[in-house]
Amino acid sequence: MVVHVLILLVLGLVTIADPIKIVNVLSANYSGEEGPEVEEFTIEEIDPGDISEMEEEVVEPVDVAEAMEMVEPTPMDPMEIATVDFEVSDFASEMAPAAMSLQTVSSLNVQAMSSRSADMKKKLLRDYGGNESSEAAVTEALKWLSRHQMPNGAWTYQHNLVCNGRCGNPGEPNRAKAFNAATAMGLLPFMGAGQTHKAGEFREVVFRGLRFLVQNGKPGTQGGLPVLDLSEGAGNLYSHGLAAIALCEAYAMTEDPELLGPAQAAINYIVYAQCRDGGWRYRPQQPDGGDTSVTGWQVMALKSGYMGHLIIPPRTIQGTLLFLDKVQSNNGAMYGYAGPTTRMRASTTAIGLLCRMYTGWDKKHPGIVAGVEGLAKIGVLKNDIYYDYYAAQVLRHYGGEKWDKFNVELRDWLVSTQSQDAGAKGSWHFPNSASHRGPKEGGRLASTSFATMILEVYYRHMPLYADAAAEDEFPL
């Protein structure tokens, strides 16, 4: 409570402009001025094409038994998440004036996650193409995920160890210690369905997962600000981005003060880890610059953090815009991995377009129009659920006939391919997946997480381009 009062006092010092139409995006002006010199960070050269070469020991590894018996949920004490200490005054200098602030649906007077409430879910499910079958599939998926949570609250890509091999297709062995990434992928579908550690049928599941993330993170200080490092050798900054999204969404949905410190500290680590070109890669401040895939997860975390009124330095978003400019081609309709591409790369283009939507490009921007056209031509890729996950978000926000066609095919395919086998009921596995950093490496857990979040796309977030706002230009 004291922390919230202090934040409100600081916010009271910020001059707020006249009310404007609120749009769910992040934006910032580029001032043209160079930011502060980034401290040199020396690391080994990394081959971006082979993540398996980056194995290292987790600082505090979590023991995983070779086989585990399922445990019954135990009554939970009040929230015992260890907070990361910080002072509100530490962030006062990072807050942007009202004219430069990052805009979001949660700004000042809108509930950030209202789309996940029971009544709004029903409306958005109906309006944007969900149905009873897709919701039933989500319910079964959450049951499968809950059955595969470890006793310590974590999830593992070696999910078969938790269920004593009752369902197969675990992730690759070199992902076995990516507990933070796996736990985030286990948690996010619950929160997408409106479940929190405070309310819902699965609140104890969510509580244990959040507690694990906070306790397994590595607290520290960077640039005078507290950070919570959730990266790990088997998942690097992919792990941090995913885990930061989970912490920030949980805080945005509940405003639980116990999560404020960890969520803000996780955001601070993203700010610290940004590369000189404005993107993110496997390691903090990697000298060879960012890549679109890792950058996408960090931008999603920044968006989730700002939806919870956490503090995002405008220069971080300015850097992101520079990175997107670097990797775009065809006037922003296509996006490469670490530089511009001469051919359509499905997954990185979908990621780049979603980042553009979140950072201010409106529905009529030529890059958005042409990019959406390109994704619509590609359609659903049944061998790349990672692409499908991002493309579904882009097309759903864009709306119209292209989304309707894409949605029906993707929705019905996912519903029809959900496992009905006894041990694996409610899950998915795509054995021929070509996904970059997706189910091919994360196994049945990653496949199930992506598929479930796709089926929650109707209500996971409010639409960026609502009919009433579609004609408005976003004020930069």
What are the residue ranges of the model-derived segments?
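Extracytoplasmic/periplasmic juxtamembrane low-complexity linkers enriched in Pro
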Residues: M1, L6-E72
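An alpha-helical repeat/solenoid feature that recognizes helix-turn-helix modules
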Residues: I7, S93-K143, R147, Y157-V205, ...
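Exposed boundary/loop context
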Residues: V25, T42, F86-E87, F91-A92, ...
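Extracytoplasmic intrinsically disordered, low-complexity "stalk/linker" and propeptide segments
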Residues: E55-M113
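Patatin-like phospholipase
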Residues: L213
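Acidic Ca2+-chelating loop motifs
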Residues: G153-W155
